Amino acid sequence: METVRIIYVRDNQTLKTVFVDRDGTINRDCPYCHELDDLQIYDDTVGILKHYQGKGYRIIIVTNQSGIGRGYFSMEEFRRFNDGVVNRLLDLGVKVSATYFCPHRPDEGCSCRKPGIGLINEALSDFRVDIGGSLVIGDRDDVDGQLARNLGLPFRIVSH
């Protein structure tokens, strides 16, 4: 199983980018989120993302999804839930360009699982990113914050 990407909007611009965690940051973190009935978007995160989007930042979701590797839900169930998140954000005025996710279990030792930088490297191969002007937003300093530190980027923690 490889790092997986879902690209919603392609562009050729070099843009500052917000790399944002999904579960616990954009939406309520439920155990291995994959049911649309469980989807609850955090208004404060929407406001933060709209702020950066208004300043010309691209929005890209980066998320660990070990529930796939553990067999708790399928790739199709993940995609359906993630599309629900992205569509809800779009309804609220936030355009997500792509989602990059690691489907592996933590014990698999892959290079894409956050706080490793594999997901970001994939995004950098698909998009022109002003990495020096970019940042990471997430709810966990040990994962999202460490990802930011590994990249030398600022980190904005959100808590709900």
UniProtKB/Swiss-Prot annotation:
It comes from the Archaea. This is Probable D-glycero-D-manno-heptose-1,7-bisphosphate 7-phosphatase. The record marks T63, K114 as: Stabilizes the phosphoryl group. It holds the Pfam family PNK3P. Its EC number is 3.1.3.-. It comes from Thermoplasma acidophilum (strain ATCC 25905 / DSM 1728 / JCM 9062 / NBRC 15155 / AMRC-C165). InterPro entries: HAD-like_sf, HAD-SF_hydro_IIIA, HAD_sf, Heptose_bisP_phosphatase, Histidinol-phos, PNK3P. Keywords: Carbohydrate metabolism, Cytoplasm, Hydrolase, Magnesium, Metal-binding, Zinc. Zn(2+) binds at C102, H104, C110, C112. Monomer. One of its GO terms (biological process) is carbohydrate metabolic process. One of its GO terms (cellular component) is cytoplasm. Substrate binds at D21, R22, D23, D29, C30, P31, Y32, T63, N64, Q65, S66, R113, K114. Mg(2+) binds at D21, D23, D139. Signal peptide: none annotated.
